[in-house]
């Protein structure tokens, strides 16, 4: 689970929320342990999007088999994003503050274009890209631009980003993209249309906020 502060705070301490988290799980009969995880990076793949300012925690609890939830907290987030409050009803009614979809779209496109995994492709980025375009959500380019500045040290215009996106979409091995997604979809035939040209045409349909 990914979380972000609303503004940078190098002194943020997630530990002070532990009691509240443990108590929330306890109300539904789950005993949990929370441990801060050391950020040991053994390869460039693992470090691709792991920032120095991201704290990582493991929340573990026991069901029929042990479940572990990884929580990441970005204490130095790229700015120029908007949030909204969403009502959830389970396990009890509560409000949660979320990035809006235009900013989540921006984060997804940053990952798709700049994720430095060599020959490995995270097909779920491509699946989500298709979902945002098909559902007509606009992309907040100003937030995307901030992400690129912070992660990649580049100040990129909209046209420059589009060129970089087309380069990525045209050169990727779509077979590898599909292989990463197959375990997560009920009907693999929904990806029959996927091709380099298909995604390049989707790129031309992106609406910017």
Residue spans of the language-model regions?
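A short glycine/small-residue-enriched secondary-structure motif
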Residues: 1-4
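Structured mid-to-C-terminal alpha-helical surface segments
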Residues: 6-209
């Amino acid at each position: 689970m990914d979380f972000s502060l609303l503004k940078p705070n190098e002194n943020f301490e997630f530990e002070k929320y532990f009691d509240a988290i443990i108590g929330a799980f306890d109300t539904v009969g789950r005993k949990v342990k929370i441990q801060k995880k050391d950020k040991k990076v053994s390869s460039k793949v693992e470090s691709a999007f792991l920032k120095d300012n991201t704290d990582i925690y493991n929340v573990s609890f026991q069901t029929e088999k042990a479940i572990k939830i990884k929580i990441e907290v970005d204490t130095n987030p790229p700015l120029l994003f908007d949030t909204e409050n969403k009502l959830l009803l389970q396990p009890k009614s509560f409000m949660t503050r979320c990035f809006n979809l235009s900013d989540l779209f921006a984060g997804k496109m940053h990952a798709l274009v700049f994720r430095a995994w060599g020959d490995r492709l995270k097909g779920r980025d491509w699946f989500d890209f298709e979902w945002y375009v098909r559902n007509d959500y606009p992309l907040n380019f100003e937030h995307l631009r901030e992400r690129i500045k912070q992660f990649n040290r580049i100040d990129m215009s909209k046209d420059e980003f589009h060129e970089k996106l087309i380069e990525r979409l045209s050169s990727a091995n779509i077979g590898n993209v599909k292989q990463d997604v197959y375990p997560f979809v009920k009907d693999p035939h929904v990806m029959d249309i996927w091709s380099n040209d298909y995604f390049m045409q989707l790129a031309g349909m992106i609406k910017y906020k």
